[in-house]
Amino acid sequence: MADFVQAWAYAEESVVEDPITASARDLAAEFGIRSISPATGNFLRMLTALSGATAAVEVGTGTGVSGLYLIQDSSLTLTTIDIESEAQHHAREFFRQAGARAGRVRVINGASADILPRLATSSYDFVLLDGDPLEAEGDATECLRLLRRGGLLVVAHALLGGKVADPARREDDVVATRNLIKHLSRTEGITTSLVPIGDGLLLARID
């Protein structure tokens, strides 16, 4: 187990962030916002590149950390949703600093439960779900509706620092995340994979 932990730490430390993303991460910490790890961000960037995704949705803008990784692929447009307007204001500035052209990143302020139903069905290739774990199952249902065939839903923080794997942990967010994993794994027409990178990623692909 010690070797695995050491290997995990080595992989996590192998990614060097650009100054803009690092600044967004530092600000997120000041806001108390949980960000994906650099290795996770790099993995997401790889997923979008390999899948050829051109249209993505993100639930949970934060200060823009994950979005900055997603838009490193110049062909991808991003719609990002969050209820926290102050953090989103900073995210807009970080996207601008990163060179995102006008119209490439659409930042929407509002609750995911209100915004997701307004987005067009089967119009996106990639969705990153990084919102409130207590709302994740309902959000995931809407996110799957948005995806085209072959599209990919990625749920961030799917292991919650290892708490999801500990049967003794019964906090609300842990139980909700376990239920989401079970729900998606039992949903017909999708293939799932739980990846132990960063804080965990749950991948669900539309067959």
Task: For each feature predicted by the language model, list its residue ranges.
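Class I SAM-dependent transferase core
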Residues: 1-57
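S-adenosylmethionine/decaboxylated-SAM
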Residues: 38-207
